[in-house]
């Protein structure tokens, strides 16, 4: 994914405000062997790019003054109530150095899972992304979570996922966290419990 930026020579609160008033967003690219570089980007193009999932979890071709660098989006600051991007940070990446990136999960076959189709349950997304470690070339845009065989009451854990080659998940605390589950809606579960309580054993 290509991102076009321009070098920025002035900095400070006043300069950033004037930049935003002219339809630009201030930013910085850092990391690697090169010095940090102040940049500016077209606000509208950046605004639309931020709406794309891939912009947050893939290696970007960041072009600055005609020179392209591989980079990751690391942070961005939004105005508290206006549709305005105040600042954006990019980090250079090296082909030989592993990176840590949060990758979104795509839940597959939810409608056809037995627990949904036959058991009338609901799929619960316990987590929606995972932090992964990999080389830039191995970074996936997303990780598929296939819930197609799940029943009501079943929980899918990290070890149940098929990870792309070269990708490992970075866990914090729980080494095998729950990813998804299928359960009955609250009303249905209560009704089922009520029916069970109302039953009397046969004489």
Swiss-Prot record:
It comes from the Bacteria. SUPFAM superfamilies: Ribosomal protein L25-like (SSF50715). GO terms for cellular component: cytosolic large ribosomal subunit. GO terms for biological process: translation. Keywords: Ribonucleoprotein, Ribosomal protein, RNA-binding, rRNA-binding. GO terms for molecular function: 5S rRNA binding; structural constituent of ribosome. The keyword Nucleotide-binding does not apply. InterPro entries: Rbsml_bL25/Gln-tRNA_synth_N (IPR020056), Ribosomal_bL25/Gln-tRNA_synth (IPR011035), Ribosomal_bL25_b-dom (IPR020057), Ribosomal_bL25_C (IPR037121), Ribosomal_bL25_long (IPR001021), Ribosomal_bL25_short (IPR020055), Ribosomal_L25_dom (IPR029751), Ribosomal_uL5_bac-type (IPR020930). PANTHER family: RIBOSOMAL PROTEIN L25/GLN-TRNA SYNTHETASE, ANTI-CODON-BINDING DOMAIN-CONTAINING PROTEIN (PTHR33284), RIBOSOMAL PROTEIN L25_GLN-TRNA SYNTHETASE, ANTI-CODON-BINDING DOMAIN-CONTAINING PROTEIN (PTHR33284:SF1). This is one of the proteins that binds to the 5S RNA in the ribosome where it forms part of the central protuberance. Belongs to the bacterial ribosomal protein bL25 family. CTC subfamily. NCBIfam families: bL25_bact_ctc, PRK05618.1-2, PRK05618.1-5, PRK05943.1. Part of the 50S ribosomal subunit; part of the 5S rRNA/L5/L18/L25 subcomplex. Contacts the 5S rRNA. Binds to the 5S rRNA independently of L5 and L18. This is Large ribosomal subunit protein bL25. The gene is rplY.
